[in-house]
């Protein structure tokens, strides 16, 4: 069953943007999770968080008490071997891998209209390179990009361009799969 064996690689869990991870993992709002058809929740050992740089104390406690794996910004940007190792680990225990990115994980210069940015994030091209590595694997099947500033919060369309860079990275990974599918 798809929803029983899906893995998430999460960009950042701060503020309410982390709520979907907690719900999906069965750590909060159990009725919401069940009503969405996700029962049981995703095992925390099937979740990898990347480039997390700013957790409030309660979030930090919850994440540290779980089996969530982590990839640092440096890992995502400079260690494709570690990215591949996490994807391979997840592929052994899941049917489908979902990659989720909250745009506030990026370098604040690329998402200037986002209220939750934190310094020292990867650029969209850097994270796009990590997405290329991830999406080379056939079990990496879905990408979510959330909280992209738009309209008056992105007058120069920098955030939109950053989101496109992420999509291009993922699509390049799919293109490089054997068989190109």
Describe every region a protein language model picked out.
Residues 69-181:
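Catalytic cores of soluble, metal-dependent hydrolases
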Residues 47, 68-69:
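Short, conserved active-site loop motifs that form the nucleotide-linked donor/cofactor pocket
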Residues 1, 25, 51-54, 72-74, ...:
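Short, structured patches in soluble enzyme cores that scaffold and shape functional sites
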Residues 54-61:
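Short, glycine/polar-rich helix-capping loops at beta-to-alpha or helix-loop-helix junctions
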Residues 1, 50, 99-103:
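Active-site flanking residues adjacent to catalytic metal/cofactor-binding acidic residues
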Residues 1-36, 40, 137-141:
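Active-site histidine-anchored catalytic micro-motif
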Residues 40-41, 45-54:
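An alpha-beta-alpha
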Residues 3-4, 54, 103-107:
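Short, glycine/acidic-enriched loop or turn micro-motifs at the edges of active sites
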């Amino acid at each position: 069953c798809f929803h029983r064996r899906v893995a998430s690689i999460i960009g950042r869990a701060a503020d309410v943007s982390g709520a979907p991870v907690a719900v999906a993992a069965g750590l909060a709002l159990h009725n919401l999770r069940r009503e969405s058809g996700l029962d049981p929740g995703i095992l925390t050992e099937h979740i990898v968080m990347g480039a997390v740089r700013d957790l409030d104390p309660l979030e930090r406690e919850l994440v540290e008490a779980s089996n969530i794996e982590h990839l640092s910004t440096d890992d995502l940007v400079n260690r494709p071997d570690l990215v591949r190792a996490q994807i391979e680990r997840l592929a052994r225990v899941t049917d489908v891998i979902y990659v989720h990115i909250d745009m506030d994980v990026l370098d604040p210069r690329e998402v200037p209209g986002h209220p939750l940015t934190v310094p020292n994030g990867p650029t969209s091209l850097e994270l796009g390179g990590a997405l290329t590595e991830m999406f080379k694997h056939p079990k990496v099947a879905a990408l979510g990009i959330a909280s992209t500033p738009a309209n008056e919060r992105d007058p120069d369309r920098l955030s939109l361009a950053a989101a496109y860079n992420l999509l291009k990275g993922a699509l390049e990974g799919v293109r490089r799969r054997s068989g190109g599918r």
